[in-house]
Amino acid sequence: MDGIKYAVFTDKSIRLLGKNQYTSNVESGSTRTEIKHWVELFFGVKVIAMNSHRLPGRGRRMGPIMGQTMHYRRMIITLQPGYSIPPLRKKRT
């Protein structure tokens, strides 16, 4: 899995599963066309739409030093009716 890091399971993403939309975090340097091509090739599905947004990094403190986590990109992938993606591994939060 080059582009997709892990599936996202929030209240909104679980609600979107009923509309055949799947949510996952992807590498921030990946483009929409790369992710679409990769999903269609790996899962054997037809993607009809993709929405993406970049989420900001958060501040992390280690003692007196304040750090920053990396920003990441989240994709919402809409599939054609009749296609589905098996559940991806869930990342524990």
UniProtKB/Swiss-Prot annotation:
GO MF term list: mRNA binding; rRNA binding; structural constituent of ribosome
SUPFAM superfamilies: Ribosomal proteins S24e, L23 and L15e
Name this protein carries in UniProt: Large ribosomal subunit protein uL23cz/uL23cy
Gene name for this UniProt entry: rpl23-A
Physiological role: Binds to 23S rRNA.
GO cellular component term of the entry, any: ribonucleoprotein complex
Keywords assigned by UniProt, alphabetized: Chloroplast, Plastid, Ribonucleoprotein, Ribosomal protein, RNA-binding, rRNA-binding
Quaternary organization: Part of the 50S ribosomal subunit.
Taxonomic superkingdom: Eukaryota
Family recorded in the similarity comment: Belongs to the universal ribosomal protein uL23 family.
GO biological process: translation
InterPro entries the record matches: Nucleotide-bd_a/b_plait_sf, Ribosomal_uL23-like, Ribosomal_uL23/eL15/eS24_sf, Ribosomal_uL23_CS
Disulfide bridge map: none
Subcellular location: Plastid, Chloroplast
